[in-house]
């Protein structure tokens, strides 16, 4: 089981427009300590939207 201080935790990316959680990815906490934000395709909206890391 993964510990809470894992260097590469799994994170969920949610669309900022419709709030759907579309993507699951990993990130390195040492290189990116703050929340990740990427432009990805949202299937619910049907276009590229900004996706932000959720907790």
UniProtKB/Swiss-Prot annotation:
Domain of life: Bacteria
SUPFAM superfamilies documented for this protein: Zn-binding ribosomal proteins
Record GO biological process: translation
Keywords from the named record: Ribonucleoprotein, Ribosomal protein
Entry GO terms, CC: cytoplasm; ribonucleoprotein complex; ribosome
Disulfide bridge map: none
MF terms in GO: structural constituent of ribosome
UniProt xrefs under InterPro entries: Ribosomal_bL33, Ribosomal_bL33_CS, Ribosomal_bL33_sf, Ribosomal_zn-bd
Pfam families from the UniProt entry: Ribosomal_L33
Similarity comment: family membership: Belongs to the bacterial ribosomal protein bL33 family.
HAMAP family according to UniProt: Ribosomal_bL33
PANTHER family: 50S RIBOSOMAL PROTEIN L33, CHLOROPLASTIC, LARGE RIBOSOMAL SUBUNIT PROTEIN BL33C
Protein name per the record: Large ribosomal subunit protein bL33
């Amino acid at each position: 089981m993964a510990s809470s201080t894992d260097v590469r935790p799994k994170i969920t990316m949610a669309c900022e427009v419709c709030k759907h959680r579309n993507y699951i990815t990993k990130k390195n906490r040492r290189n990116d300590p703050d929340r990740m934000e990427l432009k990805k395709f949202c299937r619910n909206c049907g276009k590229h939207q900004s996706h932000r890391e959720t907790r």
